[in-house]
Regions:
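C-terminal catalytic domains of large/alpha subunits in multi-subunit enzymes
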Residues: 2-291, 532
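C-terminal structural segment of proteins
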Residues: 252, 257, 268-579
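Residue-level marker for well-ordered alpha-helical positions
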Residues: 1, 52, 243-244, 307, ...
Length: 579
């Protein structure tokens, strides 16, 4: 870009061989962008040598007294005082070459002298400085500790902005990494000097969905030490974000904070919680106690029919694979051979159709197709809402509802709505077919009643009641995409003249498995929905949750936050039924 600007030619006419950053001397206040400051000056040095040779060759033709009288713009070289005297850049190159002048040159840049006394801690260690200021506008949910960044203003003095798109990109990336990543998500876990964060299921990086709106302001103070007056932009953006976020959150919650990242727990409790060492979220491990980076132990069978798939599943050790979003991750934890049966192409597992007013959902239906299906949207809105929160668009295009239930993670997003609708699961093997409620099929975290030779073929949801229901689904997660649900609450209510006639509640990512909160339902059913009833039901819920998970490492956060989510849901229902 600097060479193109110097010669006044289009960028596509410049060929650039990018060196390793380490080959370029440190540029001072930024390191990774030293190429702009140090390398840029060297490029201009070489370009000016060549331009002088060109000027000597065409000076008489352009009637120029010196190189200062010559302009280089838009692929032309002309007399700046008499623009009609003009040559194309190619003509200038040809005329210069005809004189025998060399059209190549080395450029050099020697940084100005600096002084730094390490012993006294004084001096000026850099020959140029960048300045910046960032402001964060945030909203904090005091019930959950969830931070929403509404807007960011990033003002940076970078000298002359050479590449506006590149400058903006550096600011966007720096704010996302510094403010959202370092400031909110990247919880690096060490114990006794040993790193426990082994993978990206615990060390969370921000996604594009977490990018806030950013107003970018470039302050262009010309700097004589930089190429064309430019400074640099890079690390300085990163360094401001977390501090701006922390100050904003501290003002919002009226409490100073001196610990990063500002996790949900840190904001809500005032201290962070560390999960005990474990191998992965899937709770799978091999004797090697590690994850492998390459899967070279897989063998894949591709049946053409469901009958053929069931025959293959009868073989010892066979595992089905559809979307692969869980199975492939789990396979990295295993050191032995993993024989897979690919059921992704079986059409009979991808059907959604009406069953006596209810619906049948094939186990191979991906979440994208499930969410957009009109039968699901019209009859079972909480299921559609919950499944929209699964992973990311790419994952929803692959992940299947069958895999989500068979994996049986406590945080499985599709499970609570299926339970609240009394859904049944149909299992099939070469031996026969059986059905059972989803609530009974999952017996605990990552544990089901599925036999080794069985496949989940479909889920059957009964016809929904024709009476008007108030449906609610509340979900809490750390990120806006690629998110593992921290906890959720699914609710169905029928309220008549202020009295709760029907109530169904299912937790998510709270206890060992999602389940109906029957004691709480009983505390609400038949009662007038008012503040006193909510307080009483919240007390019943607190006792149940405390008994179930009170001894866990996460209980100091999960218990009060879940109670607050419950109160929020009932307040919303009470408000809606009054309309």
């Amino acid at each position: 870009l600097l060479a193109a600007e110097a010669f006044g030619i289009a960028l596509d006419r410049v060929m650039f061989s990018e060196p390793a950053t380490a080959m370029i001397a440190d540029g001072g206040s930024t390191v990774a962008l030293r190429g702009t400051l140090m390398g840029g000056q060297a490029i201009l040095s070489a370009a000016n040598k060549i331009k002088q040779r060109m000027a000597d060759a065409v000076r008489e033709t352009l009637k120029a007294q010196s190189i200062d009288d010559i302009a280089w713009q838009n692929g032309n070289v002309f007399n700046r005082h008499n623009p009609e005297l003009s040559l194309s850049f190619q003509q200038v190159c040809d005329m210069t070459r005809a004189t025998g002048a060399n059209l190549s040159a080395y450029g050099w840049h020697v940084a100005p002298n600096i002084h730094w006394d390490e012993e006294k801690g004084c001096g000026s260690p850099y020959f140029t400085w960048v300045y910046g200021c960032q402001l964060a506008d945030v909203a904090v949910d005091m019930r959950t500790g969830k931070i929403t960044v509404n807007n960011v203003v990033a003002t940076h003095d970078v000298g002359k902005v050479i590449n506006p798109v590149g400058f903006s990109g550096q600011v966007y990336g720096g704010v996302l990494q510094g403010m959202i990543g370092y400031g909110m998500l990247e919880d690096f876990n060490t114990e006794h000097g040993v790193v426990k964060s082994e993978n990206f299921d615990t060390y969370l990086l921000p996604t594009i969905k977490d990018m806030p709106h950013i107003d970018i302001i470039a302050v262009e103070n010309y700097d004589k030490a930089g190429p064309m007056g430019a400074k640099v932009i890079g690390e300085p953006v990163l360094e401001l974000g977390a501090a701006a976020l922390n100050n904003a959150v501290s003002f919002a919650i009226d409490r100073p904070n001196r610990t990063l990242p500002l996790t949900l727990e840190q904001v809500r409790l005032g201290y962070n919680l560390k999960k005990p060492e474990r191998q992965s979220e899937q709770m799978l491990e091999s004797g090697d106690k590690k994850q492998v980076h390459r899967l070279n132990t897989l063998s894949l069978s591709v049946p053409q029919t469901l009958k053929e798939a069931l025959t293959l599943m009868a073989e010892k050790g066979a595992m089905p694979i559809a979307g692969g979003t869980d199975v492939l991750v789990q396979a990295r934890m295993l050191s032995g051979e993993v024989p897979l049966v690919n059921i992704a192409g079986l059409a009979e597992l991808k059907e959604i159709f009406d069953v006596e007013g209810g619906v049948s959902i094939g186990s191979g239906v991906c979440f994208t197709d499930l969410v957009k299906h009109p039968l699901i949207q019209q009859r079972y809105p909480p299921l559609a809402t919950a499944c929209k929160t699964v992973g990311s668009l790419q994952l929803r295009n692959r992940a299947t509802i069958g895999g989500n239930i068979v994996n049986a993670a406590p945080c499985a997003d599709s499970m609570p709505p299926l339970i609240i609708y009394d859904a049944e699961v149909e299992l099939r093997s070469a031996r026969g077919t059986r059905r059972m409620p989803v609530s009974e099929f999952v017996v605990g975290g990552y544990r089901t009643l599925l036999e080794p030779d069985e496949l989940v073929v479909r889920f059957i949801l009964p016809a929904p009641t024709q009476q008007p229901l108030i449906n609610r689904y509340l979900q809490l997660g750390r990120r806006n995409a690629l998110n593992i649900t921290r906890q959720s609450l699914t609710g169905q209510f029928m309220v008549d003249k202020g009295v709760v006639r029907l109530c169904r509640l299912v937790d998510g990512a709270l206890m060992a498995k999602p389940q109906r909160l029957t004691e709480v339902e009983q505390a609400l059913t038949g009662k007038t929905l008012d503040a006193a009833t909510i307080d009483y039901a919240a007390g019943v819920l607190h006792d149940k949750v405390e008994k179930a998970i009170g001894g866990r490492w996460s209980a100091p956060y999960k218990v009060p936050v879940f109670i607050d989510m419950f109160r929020q849901m009932l307040q919303e229902v009470m408000t809606e039924q009054k309309k």
